[in-house]
């Protein structure tokens, strides 16, 4: 009898085993980590928020930052998804602050609702001032321009009125001389007699009138 020699399995020639320590494996791990990090908040921002509640000499390890980073990101996704469902039911495309507060209340975080409402009101007031500030400045400029224009119009009208008054005065003085002006200033230089000459020409008539009054 001939013994059959067992066939040696040398593996499939088309399949290559990957070594965990190879450069390609490290590249794949880095790509996966980058994709995972894209879903999270920036770890620098998370670290700054965490340091605000620590003493000045307090320190935070890297794994603590990464843990909080993942938890916060998942929480944000959770709340945003609930608010998004509400907007879809109401056929709206934009999630607003009221939707976020509604989602937090629905998910059972009632203790956070009151401070979030206070923050939302302050935020809206601040943003409203930023938006309205250019409009208010533009309105002030328009009001100043209107006031300046009205002032110029008033000065022009006042000057025009003064010119009209001067014209009327000169016209009256030229065509209607004042009776209180001296004889030398009367505008009739071509007249050949004066009040004195009239008295000289009619002295007798004047005396007769006086005698008739006495008698």
Curated annotation (Swiss-Prot):
Compositional bias ranges of the Low complexity kind: 136-151
Record-level GO BP terms: response to heat; response to water deprivation
Keywords (A to Z) from UniProt: Activator, DNA-binding, Nucleus, Transcription, Transcription regulation
SUPFAM superfamilies registered for this protein in UniProt: Histone-fold
DNA-binding region ranges: 41-47
InterPro entries cross-referenced by the UniProt entry: CBFA_NFYB_domain, Histone-fold, Transc_fact_NFYB/HAP3, Transcrpt_fac_NFYB/HAP3_CS
Region annotation Disordered: where it falls in the sequence: 1-40, 130-151
UniProt GO molecular function: DNA-binding transcription activator activity, RNA polymerase II-specific; DNA-binding transcription factor activity; protein heterodimerization activity; sequence-specific DNA binding
Protein's UniProt keywords contain Metal-binding: no
Expression induction or repression: Repressed by heat and dehydration stress.
Annotated tissue distribution: Expressed in flowers and green siliques.
Subunit architecture: Heterotrimeric transcription factor composed of three components, NF-YA, NF-YB and NF-YC. NF-YB and NF-YC must interact and dimerize for NF-YA association and DNA binding. Binds directly with DPB3-1.
Function summary: Component of the NF-Y/HAP transcription factor complex. The NF-Y complex stimulates the transcription of various genes by recognizing and binding to a CCAAT motif in promoters.
UniProt-recorded name of the protein: Nuclear transcription factor Y subunit B-7
Organism: Arabidopsis thaliana
